[in-house]
Each structure stands twice: as structure tokens, then as C-alpha cells.
Amino acid sequence: MLHVSMVGCGAIGRGVMELLKSDPEVVFDVVIVPEHTMDEARDAVTALAPGARVATHLDDQRPDLLVECAGHHALEEHIVPALERGIPCMVVSVGALSEPGMAERLEAAARRGGTQVQLLSGAIGAIDALAAARVGGLDEVIYTGRKPARAWAGTPAEQLFDLDALTEATVIFEGTARDAARLYPKNANVAATVSLAGLGLDRTSVKLLADPHAVENVHHVEARGAFGGFELTMRGKPLAANPKTSALTVFSVVRALGNRAHAVSI
């Protein structure tokens, strides 16, 4: 049985608890949220993980695993201290590692605690193949992200383009993964995950498109190297509770927790 504490009780966290509420091998003990959201979180936790308690931080708890589903800010506030205490962690908000020094702080904390932090694949597939290809040497990795035009509301694209007036797919960004993550932090998780599995933030090429005709999030990865080459296209349906998040992100957390809890892992 795997005893899990989770940071976050938003769309992703609730989706994870919903899918695992009938799995006896995964038990949620603590759900960590900001103080001003505790009442709302208690209602959700009571329905989805009635054995768990809601708290603002981990206290002296030592779960088997701490999983982050809360956003970039949670890494510094909760994940780094947990790693230093020797608690294994999983991270959904991989885009946070594009922030200067964050990847190094996570690694240093895990080393000090004698534990490990796992970066989850989230909304993208073939990360295992890309990471394996890196062993033999990669020459080029290109990530293209296409989303409905309104999915880019609240980003720099809204200042550069009239998103409601677009009539065709429009490139809103082209550059490195590091710059993409800096300019579009709420849309950076996939680009950052691809980068960290492959050539890194400064050598991974990224193109982002706003498409008025798109009804789903489309992720395309091209990779070439000593292994040969591959192309992957994924058409992800957005999470109903948060259209900026792919439903596959929730499924990837559930799979990762199942792999830790169950006798067979794949």
C-alpha cells in the first residue's frame, strides 16, 4: 500500500483522486492547499478521499511519496523541503524547471535527502523513447504546440494578436524551449518535459500556434539522432475543469502512482 500526500486540489488533483478512489493500493493521507482554499478543498477531499486531511503544509508527516499537482510555486514551497527530508517526490509542473536554478535546487535537495524526484510526462508521450535516444546522441528535437486561439488568452500572444479575429493557424512563438517557458509559463510543461528528456532547454526548438479551428491541444515532436528518428503527434482533449490542461496529464499522474503501488510496473 502506497501512502501519498499531494500538493494541490485543483482540476488535476481532484481528477487524480477521482480515478484512484477505488484503488486500495493508493491511499491519500494529506492534501496540501493554501489557507484561503481549505474549505473548498475539504469538500472535495471528503467526497474523493475521505480518509485524507487537508493542511497548508506537510508538518511532521512522512508519506511514502509527495506528488505535486499545484503549479510552479509549489516546488520551492513544498517539494524542495520534502526532498531535503528524504521524501520521494513526483512533479507535474515540469515547466518550473525552466526557471533559473530550479533544476539545480531540486537535484541538490534530493541528493541531500538521499532520495529522488520524478518528473512526470504529463500531456506528452514517448518521453521514454526520447530519453533513451539521448543516450546514443541526439542531433535535433523540435516541439510544436497547437491550441485553440482562446487557449492563449492571458498570455503575451494576446498582446501581439487579436485572438478572436484570427482566421487561420498563426505562429505566436518560435524559439528555444527556455524562452517559450519564460514567455508562456502556464503552457510550458510539455516543452520543458521534451527538453529535459532530450537536448535541454537551450537546444530544443519550439513553435507555438494559435489555431481558431482547433478543438483540441495538438503536440508534435520530431527527434533525430544516432538512433534514427521519430515523429509523434498527440491530439489531447482538454480537461473539462481546466481547458488549459490536457486530460492526459491527470492520467499520467494516476499511472505513475499505480506503478509505485502495484506489483507490476510498465
Curated annotation (Swiss-Prot):
Pathway: Cofactor biosynthesis; NAD(+) biosynthesis; iminoaspartate from L-aspartate (dehydrogenase route): step 1/1. It is an enzyme of class 1 (oxidoreductase). GO terms for molecular function: aspartate dehydrogenase activity; NAD binding; NADP binding; oxidoreductase activity, acting on the CH-NH2 group of donors, NAD or NADP as acceptor. InterPro entries: Asp/hSer_DH_NAD-bd, Asp_DH, Asp_DH_prok, L-Asp_DH, NAD(P)-bd_dom_sf. One of its GO terms (biological process) is NAD biosynthetic process. The keyword NADP applies. Its EC number is 1.4.1.21. NAD(+) binds at residues 123, 189. Keywords: NAD, NADP, Oxidoreductase, Pyridine nucleotide biosynthesis. It comes from the Bacteria. Pfam families: Asp_DH_C, NAD_binding_3. SUPFAM superfamilies: Glyceraldehyde-3-phosphate dehydrogenase-like, C-terminal domain, NAD(P)-binding Rossmann-fold domains. Coiled coil: none annotated. PANTHER family: ASPARTATE DEHYDROGENASE DOMAIN-CONTAINING PROTEIN (PTHR31873:SF6), L-ASPARTATE DEHYDROGENASE-RELATED (PTHR31873). Belongs to the L-aspartate dehydrogenase family. Specifically catalyzes the NAD or NADP-dependent dehydrogenation of L-aspartate to iminoaspartate. The iminoaspartate product is unstable in aqueous solution and can decompose to oxaloacetate and ammonia. This is L-aspartate dehydrogenase. It comes from Cupriavidus necator (strain ATCC 17699 / DSM 428 / KCTC 22496 / NCIMB 10442 / H16 / Stanier 337) (Ralstonia eutropha). The lineage of its organism: Bacteria, Pseudomonadati, Pseudomonadota, Betaproteobacteria, Burkholderiales. The gene is nadX.
